[in-house]
Amino acid sequence: MAGPDLTAVGAAFGRAAHVLLDDPPHVLDDTLSIRLADDETLRAAQLLAPDGRLVATRDEPRARWRATFVARARLVEDLVEERLAAGVTQLVILGAGLDTFAERRTDLTPRLRIFEVDEPGTQQWKRGRLAALGVAIPDCLRFVPLDFESGESWVQAIAAAGFDPGRPAVIVSTGVTQYISVDALTTTLRQAATLVPGTTVVATFILPQALIDAEDRELRRVTEERAAARGFPWISFYTPGDILSLAVAAGFDDVRHVSQSDLNARYFAGRRDGLRSPSGEHIVVATLGGEP
């Protein structure tokens, strides 16, 4: 059975390591995601030592690395909660990987319909791991298998799985844009823009090397090389202006850029352990005009 791609395992590891290593209060509590990864998967991702211990340390470069995954996930959860209060009850996660929102946020899921879109083999593996852990699949969750290389429309795929095209949604694409072409991202945004007003897309993007803070450049180099070694080279980089222009051109009216400084001020200010997000990854939030 095919497993998840190893970059998704790394993201899950980063979220879990925050709880295991960093001081409370924790920005996000997600240890389930790393429990999904069995020992074989963790070894393949070079995250399990020969003695069976997780390869996790409190040193600053690794701490900043995991803060990236923590901040992006928390921002998404806050946005989903905010939009749910405004009546948006559909959540679509593109390239869901080891995402555990549906299993963890039981305070919100009774009011949501969640569609996880990912490769068929990844979803089959995830179902098996949830069953092995005794974790029930929530009634609100629909797995939507999609071969992203096939050219099939993810909008059509979620509609076939029960998505209501007459109601707005939150569309999440985190940790994806660096792996796909500008044309592919443009297509994704245009497809999202065919949905009804009130729909919001939240996506991460990677800055060009020249815009990275000097102290983060070595971490950036190591992270990029590790992704390439796992078979997922980074091919696309964007300035904030680039990404906002793409969203506007696709049809979004309300677009905003969430910087590393914004994330640090919102989630990491005043922490005793000094945890903070590095400068390489930023976020775009784009909403179609009109209220849900």
Short names for language-model regions:
Residues T89, T199, D253:
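Short acidic/polar active-site loop segments enriched in Thr and Asp
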Residues D5-L6, A214-P292:
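Rossmann-like AdoMet/SAM-dependent catalytic core
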Residues I158, F163-A184:
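A short SAM/SAH-binding and catalytic strip from SAM-dependent methyltransferases
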Residues T31, E149-S150, T177-Y179, L207-L211:
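Short, catalytically relevant binding-site loops at active-site mouths
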Residues M1-V92, L98-V144, G151-E152, P165:
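Rossmann-like AdoMet
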Residues V170, L189-A210:
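Conserved beta-strand signature within the Rossmann-like core of class I S-adenosyl-L-methionine
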Residues L141-F143, S153-Q156, Y179-A192:
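A short, conserved alpha-helix within the catalytic core of class I
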